[in-house]
């Protein structure tokens, strides 16, 4: 049985779902605050310095919020990463003593999201993307956002065993659409 994997990388929340050949779609459980589970994960990263020189500890989703609260805000909390893709004014940021390009921030979040899923996702996925990125006021802004997403899908693929990722405009990237089209 083959299955399609879909990742909704959202500005505020993200989710992962699978659809099997029979059309059954399942949102996968992700860790929630307090040890529970949820079907959506906050699209948020938290960076803090580790005990060893140069060590950087990175948390994502619910764990990022918990670490931020536990540390008294001593690290760097980064949210709404996707909302900066179209902006020429934001190309990256500093956190825990080093610079991270926006592509690295997104790839880091996607690796953490994939690692939080307790199911083998296989090696292929469809990643939803907006028809128009937030803040894209010109064709150049939209192109910038799209250019910044190209490396982020390849990079997580090479570091998380996803060998075949494709981007699809929403709502075509939603689970029912995956099983009715020949994406693979």
Give the location of each predicted region.
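Conserved phosphate-binding catalytic cores of ATP/NTP-utilizing and phosphoryl-transfer enzymes
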Residues: 1-3, 157-184
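N-terminal glycine/serine-rich phosphate-binding loop of ATP-dependent small-molecule kinases
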Residues: 1-5, 12, 19-25, 155-156
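A short acidic Gly-Thr/Ser loop motif
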Residues: 7-13, 130, 177-184
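Generic beta-strand/beta-sheet core signal
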Residues: 10, 19, 128-130, 164
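Short beta-strand scaffold segments in enzyme catalytic cores
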Residues: 14-18, 43-46
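Short acidic, glycine/serine/threonine-rich loops at helix termini
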Residues: 18-19, 137-141, 172-176
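Phosphate-binding loop and its immediate beta->loop->alpha context
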Residues: 23-150
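Short helix-loop-beta junction
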Residues: 149-158
């Amino acid at each position: 049985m083959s299955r399609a994997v879909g990742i909704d990388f959202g500005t505020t929340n993200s989710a992962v779902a699978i659809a099997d050949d029979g059309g059954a779609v399942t949102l996968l459980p992700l860790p929630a605050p307090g040890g529970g589970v949820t079907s959506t994960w906050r699209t948020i990263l938290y960076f803090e310095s580790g005990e060893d020189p140069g060590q950087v500890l990175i948390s994502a989703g619910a764990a990022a919020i918990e670490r931020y609260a536990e540390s008294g805000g001593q690290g760097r909390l980064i949210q709404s990463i996707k909302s900066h893709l179209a902006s020429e004014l934001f190309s990256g940021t500093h956190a825990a003593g080093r610079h991270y390009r926006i592509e690295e921030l997104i790839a880091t979040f996607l690796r953490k999201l994939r690692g939080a899923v307790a199911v083998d996702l296989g090696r292929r996925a469809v990643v939803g993307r907006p028809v128009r990125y937030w803040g894209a006021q010109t064709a150049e802004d939209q192109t910038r956002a799209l250019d910044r997403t190209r490396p982020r899908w390849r990079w997580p693929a090479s570091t998380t065993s996803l060998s075949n990722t494709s981007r699809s405009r929403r709502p075509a990237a939603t689970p029912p659409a995956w099983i009715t089209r020949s994406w693979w």
